[in-house]
């Protein structure tokens, strides 16, 4: 896999949550090829090991580069697990310079079955009135808290260095609500608001915070 840019990230450490997924593993690969030491975070140890091995092999085959990509298993909505991963990553790869918050997703119980209500009340299991409150909380937690908590854990060293980059993953639903996906859109809107807040909050500390709408 070719990377369509060439920047020097030698000496930098990048942490990518959701790093074993399709989108974020590609981001991790690009960072590694550009010279960063990359920690990918996810919950499935076997998948993390498989993705780390594949990215390392792909970089060697495509660029003849020996890159560093390592997997770390933890739950991004569990601050204790994140803190433990932070300590391990710092000891093995160095303190975080780049944080990509890619963990996220949606659940069927938090999606309506129709786009627009056509009658007084819709009786589907997935009508607005029957949405599962636990699944809505799960979507909000994974997307929003799963972005906020890694930032709390991994940015303290950035403040000390007065340098760092945070990349959150927003969505078109952050600014333009899509039908059916109520909880996901709410969460992505919150992420965009959080990103703007952090950009101001960290503005004089040398830390950048951005959110592409993917």
Predicted segment positions?
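Conserved glycine-rich cofactor-binding loop
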Residues: 20-21
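Conserved glycine-rich Rossmann-like NAD(P)H-binding loop of the short-chain dehydrogenase/reductase
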Residues: 34-51
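Substrate-binding pocket helix/loop in short-chain dehydrogenase/reductase
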Residues: 109-128, 132-137
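Active-site helix of classical SDR
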Residues: 151, 187, 195
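Alpha-helical segment proximal to the catalytic Tyr-Lys
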Residues: 156, 200-201
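Residue(s) in the substrate-gating loop at a strand-loop-helix junction
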Residues: 171
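Active-site loop-to-helix junction immediately N-terminal to the catalytic Tyr of the SDR YXXXK motif
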Residues: 177-185, 197-199
